[in-house]
Amino acid sequence: MTSYTDKGEKHARGRFLSFHHLTFWVGNAKQAASFYCDKFGFEPCAYKGLETGSRDVVSHAIKQDKIIFVFQSPLNPGNQEMGQHMIKHGDGVKDVAFQVEDCDFLFQKAKDHGAVVVREPWIEEDEGGKVKYAVLQTYGDTTHTLLEYLGPYRGVFLPGYKEPLFRDPLLPTLPSGCLSFIDHIVGNQPDNEMVPIVEWYQKCLLFHRFWSVDDKQIHTEYSSLRSIVVTNYEETIKMPINEPAAGKKKSQIQEYVDYYGSAGVQHIALNTSNIIKAVKNLKSRGIEFLSAPDTYYEELRKKLKTAKITVKEDLNVLQELKILVDYDDKGYLLQIFTKPMQDRPTLFLEVIQRYNHFGFGAGNFKSLFEAIETDQDARGNLTIYAANGEHQVL
């Protein structure tokens, strides 16, 4: 595991502030938004569709504290772009939007360094105010929207959006999701494509390396991965980039790439200030989490006896809820991962709480991999690499 201190070049003007929102392209935006509200504690915050004058695409925006997800679906049969995207990828994250200062400058800098432009800067406005956007291509079919508020914005979400048409009376009766903000967003790459993507972020967005692990550190009996985390100068946006490494069997990173059809967003980590309450509440709402074996907690108890930090939470409760712990000499983190959010074994979510710890759970990767491999095996996807490069199921 490596942590980096060199922040590299700072933008002469403008800066990346934070994650703003995520856009999912899905087959049925209304149902997808309702699922995340019911299961994770989001609430509808804005809508754009036929009733608001949007004739081609419907958008349902949902919010929990500082987290905003937007679910979009095509309204007409002829939408080839969205239709082909869903045939190839299934439901998934299409766009990761960053709030920025000086969109024009950051966009031009990225363009000058070779970034593929999806859409040049443009402005949208309504009675709430003005917002400037630009869109760049990143890994796979995923994009980044640069979003700049041109003065205070007083609308419900962004120009063109209106109040939700319906507020489900079920939602106020359910326990809080206790989720606060996007901690990090992980992108999975095919083999040998991690470093070029990391270099794209460094060159085009002036992000820098923050943390990394290689396959010598992250492996199970069967599979392994490499990961490099990139971040903006202010270190408010964290983007781990993963790739599979050669192993005896297909890794869960390769399984993702096979089923998604390309590189894409593997998981979204949501930060909480009370993971025990969050996990209890999310389980009661019907969220399925991966399960760590009891041997993990037996080993953890042994290791913590000689650790320089003290875990405040009751280890028996963490074990009961299957929450994982990672630590160093200065602090620790608590994390847990959901099962995939759709039938394809692609996107899943993470819930994470940090105590002066800025890593990404390297100490838990082996346990996480083994838990995923159990499910992978049940799907018939824990396959052996054959000499001809094909996969064989035992």
Swiss-Prot record:
Its main location: cytoplasm. Pathway: Amino-acid degradation; L-phenylalanine degradation; acetoacetate and fumarate from L-phenylalanine: step 3/6. One of its GO terms (molecular function) is protein homodimerization activity. One of its GO terms (cellular component) is Golgi membrane. It is found in: Cytoplasm; Endoplasmic reticulum membrane; Golgi apparatus membrane. Its cofactor is Fe cation. It is a peripheral membrane protein. It comes from the Eukaryota. It catalyses: 3-(4-hydroxyphenyl)pyruvate + O2 = homogentisate + CO2. It is an enzyme of class 1 (oxidoreductase). The keyword Oxidoreductase applies. The keyword Oxidoreductase applies. Disulfide bonds: none annotated. Binds 1 Fe cation per subunit. Fe cation binds at residues 184, 267, 350. Homodimer. Belongs to the 4HPPD family. Catalyzes the conversion of 4-hydroxyphenylpyruvic acid to homogentisic acid, one of the steps in tyrosine catabolism. This is 4-hydroxyphenylpyruvate dioxygenase.
